[in-house]
Amino acid sequence: MATLTYEEALEILRQQIKDFEPEAKMEEVGVVYYVGDGVARAYGLENVMAMEIVEFQGGQQGIAFNLEEDNVGIIILGSETGIEEGHIVKRTGRILDAPVGEGLVGRVIDPLGNPLDGKGPIQFEYRSPVEKIAPGVVKRKPVHEPLQTGIKAIDAMIPIGRGQRELIIGDRATGKTTVAIDTILAQKNSDVYCIYVAVGQKRAAIARLIELLEREGAMEYTTVVVASASDPASLQYLAPFVGCTIGEYFRDNGKHALIIYDDLSKHAEAYRQLSLLMRRPPGREAYPGDVFYLHSRLLERAAKLNDDLGAGSLTALPIIETKAGDVAAYIPTNVISITDGQIYLEADLFNKGIRPAINVGLSVSRVGGAAQIKAMKQVAGTLRLELAQFRELEAFVQFASELDKATQQQINRGLRLVELLKQEPYNPIPVEKQIVLIYAGTHGYLDDIPVESVRKFEKELYAYLDNERPDILKEISEKKKLDEELEKKIKEALDAFKQKFVP
């Protein structure tokens, strides 16, 4: 066995230490002194930032939610199992962010960006902070392009524009989600990407909804963010912000996106739960004082950007569930005041078989009128008025025995218009067909047709237009307004169809 000389040993040591660089790694840590109900409190972490991700010694993550004088309140992302008093928690220096990019289209993810659809890892372009300041006034442009929902009553009387925030409000089981899903399905042949955020819903209901989107081919342009009823309140609180961040990627790159928050009532409840556990002072209905700011900072991120920034848009359809039709409760009034209008769904109408159960009197679109195509404006201008007059007369008729001819005529027309606006769920109708149908309704083509035959008239009219007069639909699509020549063609087509139609 060869022995090393003193010089050789020295040379080996010299070589070993030549490349050595002393590395000092400093980590700011804290100690957990309380854990329970999805939250933890820790001493230390003196320089932690608000909404910074922190890591527990078992690998679980949390968010610094409350920064107090002597401790930090942390909301735990996921299960609290394995976190105990005395455990070390350390800073990561990273603010909560979400993956964004076109790779998320067609995927189902949780609010932390983990895939839930079994289709492998998420392909994304970069990660973006979930809390962002909304675009300022100078960066915006007034809403002027239509976002077609495929729902006759909405496209005609409560039009929605790209970049608008339109609230869908109503009691449970009145068809709120159906209106939102119809709007997603109506984007099939457009350039709009869709994001559906499910907050606090049953997993079975979410699974049914994803299956429907896949069956209709809508998952090709849709991303679903899921925080179900069985997920912790922390994930339910984060889900809308994550969905919004995904939508902003499209908006900021000159594209168009639609986001649905289903629903913000459960989102507010999750935030209330976290705030009360953090000992924040409760206000009205035990919600914290900043619950208005919670929703306003989220919904203000939906915008139509100006041409210098690429003219992209993010349209938001938040959903609010009311209790027994009480729209004057705290959260409904908050969100009504933040949004640019509301679609009010009524249980009474739903139970009468008027579906979608939209109360046209209470529903309004404050900015959508500027986005509605001129052809629809021309045919639907009198529709709202005729329906309002019909509702008044309907109440009056209950007490009056004899009616004059004009009143009877108005009631007959109203009954047919109500029937005309009924629609099967998950069956969006192209706006060109809607225009011809509503033209028929408001110009008396249905007045002598029995009410029960109106739906048959509608179905056969669409088939007639597709097979024999596709030129009319094409012309409406191209011109986007009714001139004398086009109106003449529509009248000729309706006259010809009506002669063939058998009620």
Swiss-Prot record:
It is a peripheral membrane protein. One of its GO terms (biological process) is proton motive force-driven ATP synthesis. Its main location: membrane. Its EC number is 7.1.2.2. Keywords: ATP synthesis, ATP-binding, Cell inner membrane, Cell membrane, CF(1), Hydrogen ion transport, Ion transport, Membrane, Nucleotide-binding, Translocase, Transport. NCBIfam families: atpA, PRK13343.1. F-type ATPases have 2 components, CF(1) - the catalytic core - and CF(0) - the membrane proton channel. CF(1) has five subunits: alpha(3), beta(3), gamma(1), delta(1), epsilon(1). CF(0) has three main subunits: a(1), b(2) and c(9-12). The alpha and beta chains form an alternating ring which encloses part of the gamma chain. CF(1) is attached to CF(0) by a central stalk formed by the gamma and epsilon chains, while a peripheral stalk is formed by the delta and b chains. HAMAP family: ATP_synth_alpha_bact. This is ATP synthase subunit alpha.
